[in-house]
From Swiss-Prot:
Record-stated family: Belongs to the CbiD family.
Chain's gene name: cbiD
SUPFAM superfamilies assigned: CbiD-like (SSF111342)
Catalytic activity: Co-precorrin-5B + S-adenosyl-L-methionine = Co-precorrin-6A + S-adenosyl-L-homocysteine
Single GO MF annotation: cobalt-precorrin-5B C1-methyltransferase activity
Name of the featured protein: Cobalt-precorrin-5B C(1)-methyltransferase
Stored InterPro entries: CbiD, CbiD_sf
Keywords per UniProt: Cobalamin biosynthesis, Methyltransferase, S-adenosyl-L-methionine, Transferase
One Pfam family of this chain: CbiD
Gene3D superfamilies according to UniProt: CbiD-like
Organism: Salmonella dublin (strain CT_02021853)
Enzyme Commission identifier(s): 2.1.1.195
Single GO biological process annotation from the record: methylation
Metabolic or biological pathway, per its Swiss-Prot or TrEMBL entry: Cofactor biosynthesis; adenosylcobalamin biosynthesis; cob(II)yrinate a,c-diamide from sirohydrochlorin (anaerobic route): step 6/10
Length: 379
């Protein structure tokens, strides 16, 4: 993404699809411009931010207002041609300066509240995901300098109504929308063109001389590889939901080692032989966990608790409480077995490894020691 212009379209079946930007980018831009306005004490009508993917956005500011040491500003969400429930709505930020030296971030009207475990945010907190939290706080800190403090409130008056058209309630996020986005950019997810762009990245890596590749579902996997494995992320390629397709492409290109790295919420599906991990295609996460826990001799009580969970992260808490953390090594081995079964007709199949990690970047399990895998990747 960082190598492509934001204005460059995504092509699908001869049609140019326009990119958009996330609610996280809107909240970041709104917070930044509100902080600048309260400092300068004059209205600002346009603001620029650099997204986590390195793309610079120049956005129009709506409803700017200053009152003493407080300012409010809004950015209108634009989903491009990947229009979702939040497209066109205003995301507001209210910034109030203080002398605390600290930045506090809260969610106001129309921002959902987390009511269930399993999405990586504390119960009762605003549904502002980790990457947007970081970008909002960084943008405000850059604006106000190192000594001042600020209270930042993100709100969206249409949020509660718009959220009814999302999956938030199923995830235990109630009362509004989520502020999300790991890259800051919305790319139209036309499947074939998206798959081709991912495959093209594999081709570029192979052409550069790489023979070992790390496939991750998204940005969190790349961050884990960098921070916890100490491996050059040059070998990392995003596979999105297209696990089987990307494995087959890696084999076609002659990679000798494929390492699958991700959260169990995605990779556990591979253990069940599901190689397209989008929930619209198949979702057997709890069933797969229950089956493999049973194979390891887990009690019926644990099987019932896990079977009733809505998210893998929530199930993991029960698994830890019952002392069955060794299931993750078991699942990693099963994932590799499923991959090798898929490639059973391949003349020279690659080495396959799998590493599972938690939302807080801790290693949960692997088919063999992670240090051993990392050492091979550095060869």
């Amino acid at each position: 993404m960082s190598e492509l212009s934001f204005d460059a379209p995504v092509w699908h079946h001869g049609k140019a699809l326009r990119k958009g930007y996330t609610t996280g980018s809107c909240a970041t831009a709104a917070a930044k411009v509100a902080a600048l306005m309260v400092l300068r004490q004059h209205l600002i009508h346009q603001v620029s931010i650099v997204t986590p993917s390195g793309v610079t956005l120049c956005l129009n500011v709506e409803s700017p207002h200053i009152e003493g040491q407080q300012a409010i500003a809004a950015i209108r969400k634009d989903g491009g041609d990947d229009v979702d429930a939040t497209h066109g709505m205003l995301i507001f930020a209210r910034v109030t300066l203080n002398d605390s030296g600290e930045i506090t971030l809260t969610g106001g009207e129309g921002i959902g509240t987390v009511t269930r475990k399993g999405i990586g945010l504390p119960l009762g907190s605003a549904a502002i995901n980790r990457t947007p939290r970081h970008t909002i706080e960084s943008a405000v800190r850059e604006a106000i300098g190192p000594a001042r403090g600020a209270d930042v409130e993100i709100f969206a008056p249409e949020g509660e109504v718009r959220a009814q058209k999302t999956y938030n309630s199923r995830l235990g996020i109630l009362g509004g929308i989520s502020i999300i986005g790991t890259t800051g950019i919305v790319t139209p997810m036309s499947e074939e063109s998206w798959k081709r762009s991912l495959s093209l990245e594999l081709e570029i890596k192979r052409a550069s001389g790489l023979t070992r590749v790390i496939l991750v579902p998204g940005n969190h996997g790349e961050r884990f590889v960098r921070e916890q494995m100490g491996v050059d992320t040059q070998a990392v390629v995003t596979m999105s939901n297209f696990v089987g397709y990307m494995i087959e492409e890696a084999v076609r290109l002659g990679f000798c080692q494929i390492v699958l790295v991700g959260h169990p919420g995605k990779l556990i599906k591979i253990a069940a032989g599901i190689f397209h991990t989008h929930s619209h295609i198949a979702d057997a996460r709890m069933e797969t966990l229950v089956a493999h826990l049973a194979l390891l001799g887990a009690p019926l009580e644990l099987l019932t608790l896990v079977g009733d969970c809505d998210t893998t992260e929530a199930a993991m808490e029960h698994i830890e409480a019952y002392g069955f953390g060794h299931i993750y090594n078991h699942l990693a081995r099963r994932i590799c077995l499923r991959v090798m079964q898929m490639l059973r007709f391949t003349k020279t199949p690659p080495v396959c490894d799998a590493i599972l990690f938690s939302f807080d970047n801790h290693i949960l399990g692997s088919n063999r020691p992670v240090d051993e895998i990392a050492k091979e990747l550095q060869c």
